[in-house]
Regions:
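A short, conserved, highly charged catalytic patch centered on acidic carboxylates
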Residues: 1-126, 132-155
């Protein structure tokens, strides 16, 4: 397991008290958080809160370049279209995939299987999963997963 000391960051959150009607269903609008990486406001879900904290850790503490971070992009897994949470590039190639879960979702075999499916398409060297409290990571060497105790240095 990887221990993360999250940096202080002045997140911009705007409450959204309006509600919208969709057909006969009344839907309460959600608060939003400004994502400085995507440069837009996004719905503040529990998973998004984990994602934003992980992104700040990677950028501020690990010094991963902002320009080489992709967030919530679609990929094809056979006939299925899926979205990864975070992808870090190195030399224009996928280098690290990070799957974010909300705080009360355990990082388990299902999460690792999901990451490994993404890896089959993206061929990244590193795989990580976090729910904000628990973070696990692995490097792929000769087709096998090797557990990591830290995020690798960005080269």
């Amino acid at each position: 397991m990887i221990e993360i000391n999250y940096p202080q960051y002045p997140f911009k959150i705007r409450p959204n008290e309006a509600s919208t009607s969709i057909g006969k269903v009344q839907e309460q609008a959600k608060d939003q958080i400004f994502d400085p990486f995507r440069k837009k406001w996004v719905v503040l879900t529990p998973e998004e809160w984990v994602r934003q904290n992980i992104l700040q850790y990677l950028n501020q503490v690990c010094q991963y370049p902002t320009a080489l971070i992709a967030i919530e992009k679609s990929i094809q897994l056979g006939e299925l279209t899926k979205r990864f949470d975070i992808l870090i590039y190195n030399n224009d190639k996928p280098w690290m995939i990070i799957e974010c879960k909300k705080a009360n979702v355990a990082i388990n075999d299902k999460t690792i299987t999901q990451l490994y499916q993404y890896q089959q398409v993206l061929e990244a060297q590193y795989l990580f999963a976090s729910n904000g409290h628990e973070t696990v990571g692995a490097e792929i060497k000769t087709g096998k997963l090797h557990a990591l105790q830290n995020f690798p240095a960005y080269l």
